C-alpha cells in the first residue's frame, strides 16, 4: 500500500497527540514506554495480547499474513509481532517521521535486523491507498486522541477500508464509562493507580508532547457510541478482549 500523493497536515494531533513530535531518540522512546507502563494499567501486555489475537484470527493465522500497525508509536507492537510471527509482512504507519525513526532504531537496538522487511510510511491512515487489503491491524491508544467531530468515524472508516473482508483489528483506548454507580470509583482508581507508581516529574510530562498525550488531549467515548461508530464504518459489533479500569480493548472484524 502506498500513501496518496496529497498528504494533509493532521488536524488536532493527527492519529493521536502521542505521535506528534519534533524528534524522538531511542532513549526517549524507551522512556515513553516506561512511563506508559506506570500510567496505564496493563500497558506492558497490550502488544503481546494484540499480536496473539491477530495470530489466531482467520486471516492472520495464514503464513505471510499482511498486518498493519496504525500509529506505530515507539514500535512495541512491531517488536512483539517479530517475536511471535516473524513471517508476517508488516506495514507501520505514523504521521511523525521522527516517531518512525525512533521505532526503527528501537527494533535495531533490541532485535538486530528486525526492522528490515517492514514497510515504513509517514502518513495518516486516511491517506493510505486501499487498493490492497491487510489481513489484520493494530491501533493501540490511537482513537482516543481523535475528537468525536467526524474524525473518529473517518479513522475507523479508513481502517475498515484498509482491511480485507474478514480482517480483524484490535482497538485499545481510554473509554468514557457509561452511567453507573461504580464509574466515579473507576476514574478515581485510575488516578490512584498512577499516583501509586511513585513521583513523576509533572513539569517534564507537561512539556513533553508524546507523554502529555497519555494524560491530556484525549477524547474518550462510551461503549454505546463506539458501537455506533464501528457499525457505521463497516465493522462487526465490538468484542471485548481487555479491560483495566477505564481502558478497554475490543476486537473488530471487517464485514464483507
Role assignments for model-derived ranges:
Residues 233-256:
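Core SAM-dependent methyltransferase catalytic element
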Residues 153-165:
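A short glycine-rich, Lys/Arg-flanked "PGG" loop and its adjoining helix->strand segment in the class I
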Residues 66-70, 74-127:
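Class I SAM-dependent methyltransferase SAM/SAH-binding core
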Residues 139-143, 171:
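A short beta-strand submotif of the Rossmann-like class I SAM-dependent methyltransferase core
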Amino acid at each position: 500500500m502506498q500513501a496518496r500523493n496529497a498528504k494533509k497536515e493532521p488536524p488536532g494531533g493527527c492519529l493521536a497527540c502521542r505521535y506528534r513530535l519534533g524528534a524522538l531518540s531511542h532513549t526517549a522512546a524507551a522512556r515513553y514506554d516506561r512511563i506508559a507502563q506506570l500510567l496505564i494499567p496493563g500497558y506492558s501486555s497490550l502488544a503481546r495480547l494484540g499480536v496473539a489475537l491477530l495470530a489466531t484470527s482467520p486471516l492472520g493465522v495464514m503464513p505471510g499474513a499482511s498486518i498493519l500497525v496504525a500509529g506505530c508509536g515507539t514500535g512495541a507492537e512491531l517488536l512483539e509481532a517479530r517475536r511471535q510471527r516473524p513471517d508476517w509482512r508488516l506495514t507501520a504507519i505514523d504521521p511523525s517521521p521522527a516517531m518512525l525513526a525512533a521505532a526503527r532504531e528501537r527494533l535495531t537496538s533490541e532485535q538486530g535486523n528486525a526492522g528490515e522487511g517492514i514497510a515504513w510510511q509517514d502518513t495518516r491512515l486516511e491517506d493510505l491507498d486501499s487498493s490492497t487489503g491487510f489481513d489484520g491491524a493494530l491501533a493501540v491508544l490511537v482513537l482516543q486522541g481523535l475528537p468525536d467531530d467526524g474524525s473518529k468515524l473517518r479513522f475507523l472508516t479508513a481502517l475498515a477500508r484498509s482491511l480485507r473482508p474478514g480482517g480483524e483489528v484490535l482497538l485499545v483506548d481510554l473509554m468514557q464509562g457509561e452511567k453507573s454507580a461504580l464509574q466515579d470509583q473507576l476514574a478515581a482508581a485510575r488516578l490512584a493507580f498512577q499516583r501509586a507508581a511513585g513521583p513523576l516529574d509533572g513539569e517534564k510530562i507537561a512539556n513533553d508532547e508524546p507523554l502529555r498525550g497519555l494524560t491530556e488531549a484525549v477524547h474518550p467515548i462510551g461503549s454505546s457510541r463506539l458501537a455506533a461508530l464501528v457499525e457505521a464504518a463497516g465493522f462487526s459489533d465490538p468484542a471485548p478482549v481487555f479491560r483495566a479500569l477505564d481502558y478497554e480493548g475490543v476486537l473488530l472484524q471487517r464485514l464483507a
